[in-house]
Amino acid sequence: MVRARRTKRASVTDIYRGCKASNTCPPDVINKVEQSTIADKILKYGSAAVFFGGLGISTGRGTGGATGYVPLGQGPGVRVGGAPTVVRPGVIPEVIGPTELIPIDSVTPIDPTAPSIVSLTDSSAVDLLPGEVETIAEVHPGPIDPIEIDTPVVSGGRNTNAILEVADPHPPTRATVSRTQYNNPAFQIISEVIPTSGESSLADHVLVSEGSGGQQIGGTRTAEEIELQPLLSRYSFEIEEPTPPRRTSTPLQRARQQFSSLRRALYNRRLTEQVGVTDPLFFTSPSKLVRFQFDNPVFDEQVTQIFEQDIADFEEPPDRQFLDVVKLGRPTLTESAEGYVRVSRLGRRGTIRTRSGTQIGSQVHFYRDLSTINTEEPLEMQLLGEHSGDASIVQGPVESTLVDVNVTEVPEGVLTETSMDPDTFNSEDLLLDDAIEDFSGSQLVVGTPRRSTTSITVPRFQTPQNPTIYYQDIQGYHVSYPESRERPAIIYPTPDIPTVVIHVADSSGDFYLHPSLRWRRRKRKYL
């Protein structure tokens, strides 16, 4: 039996606040809040006559009052918990008196040869502030290279004319030619560098010569022959595939623990029902499998969904597998035992509902597997392009064809071939194209190159067409079959004696009972 919940009662202060305005408070509430009970009055009147201050009564400090605890037959009391007295050494105070008197010298007359600037500072005054600290820093600058500045040179004397050397306003510019090469392992190019003016080093060709001279020190000995091994190109590289292939990017221990706990919750057959879903709506709109509803583009289906249903209303779900589902969790991607990618949702059914409103149901694991992703073989990278040199020279006059035509003169045979009048002939008429385009049997393509094209085939008709006239035969045809079948006639049983006889010709609509159905009078036998 469930115990009733205990309701918290209102305090005396809350009752006093609510009933004081309407003057409906009980007397005990007023006495307790306003401290007008008998005990309060005794304390008020007794405290006016008797003073117990300093004794520490009902304070809970445990100090024994102002005099402390005094044992019987002993000296004065001792305070409990008092702070110890700190003994400080005595310091001789300094005598504060007037400052020393400085005598004032008599006024000395100013010498006529003395300077007119008089210093206002008195060197005999007492400086109360601390003395200034003089800081001396020696700076030794480094050697500075002389900078050559082109300035005009002026040479001459008193009796010679001035000669000015004027600098060139447009000095020659100094050009620096450099070359930078970046190595890209995904792109290999075979180039022949054409040296330009001003470049003295090329990094593509290195010449090594042996036996070109030198001086030999010591005796003659056989040189050691070292077999050279072919070195790989600097542009080639290999990617090692892990064995076995990795399935996760960051295999952390924490992620494995979460995956194991989730797997126990989904695949526990004793506590969770396993239901495989075949409808593809389970990926995008799983709520449509639970109940009929309209599409809401704002609603996100990738969350936990709760379906509420009244007891009196019962709706058949679109899919019988989602019957009585009241909660459907968010999607979870896992891996099945066969290696497929599985989309799982953990739901709960509301099969039983108690009188208090509690729903009881089992947990259901809805899942659907995706197709496998096969491992493709790696593709070998090919060279993007090769050329024989850095620069391409195109000579227009050599590769183009020039035709010199005099438009003022009519070529021979043109008027004959084109059947033109020599009086109205114009040289621009030769540029006209008289070709006739024939689009019969062609195909019309509608669309842009970036989008999918739609092909429309235009049929080709022959002209003129002979009309086709269809005549319908009115007489028809008679088809005789070689075999005949007899269908049995069904005879429905009819009663011999009618129950009710209705006269149709009679306008009254009355009926007569058959004489055989009338009650027969029983004749009694008299003894």
From Swiss-Prot:
Subunit structure: Interacts with major capsid protein L1. Interacts with E2; this interaction inhibits E2 transcriptional activity but not the DNA replication function E2. Interacts with host GADD45GIP1. Interacts with host HSPA8; this interaction is required for L2 nuclear translocation. Interacts with host importins KPNB2 and KPNB3. Forms a complex with importin alpha2-beta1 heterodimers via interaction with the importin alpha2 adapter. Interacts with host DYNLT1; this interaction is essential for virus intracellular transport during entry.
Source organism of the structure: Human papillomavirus 38
GO molecular function: DNA binding; structural molecule activity
Post-translational modifications reported in the UniProt record: Highly phosphorylated.
Chain positions of motif Nuclear localization signal: 1-10, 519-526
GO BP field: microtubule-dependent intracellular transport of viral material towards nucleus; symbiont entry into host cell; viral penetration into host nucleus
Entries under InterPro entries matching the protein: Late_L2 (IPR000784)
Name of this protein: Minor capsid protein L2
Subcellular location: Virion; Host nucleus; Host early endosome; Host Golgi apparatus
UniProtKB keywords: Capsid protein, Cytoplasmic inwards viral transport, Disulfide bond, DNA-binding, Host endosome, Host Golgi apparatus, Host nucleus, Host-virus interaction, Late protein, Microtubular inwards viral transport, Phosphoprotein, Viral penetration into host nucleus, Virion, Virus entry into host cell
Pfam families the UniProt entry points to: Late_protein_L2
Disulfide bonds: 19-25
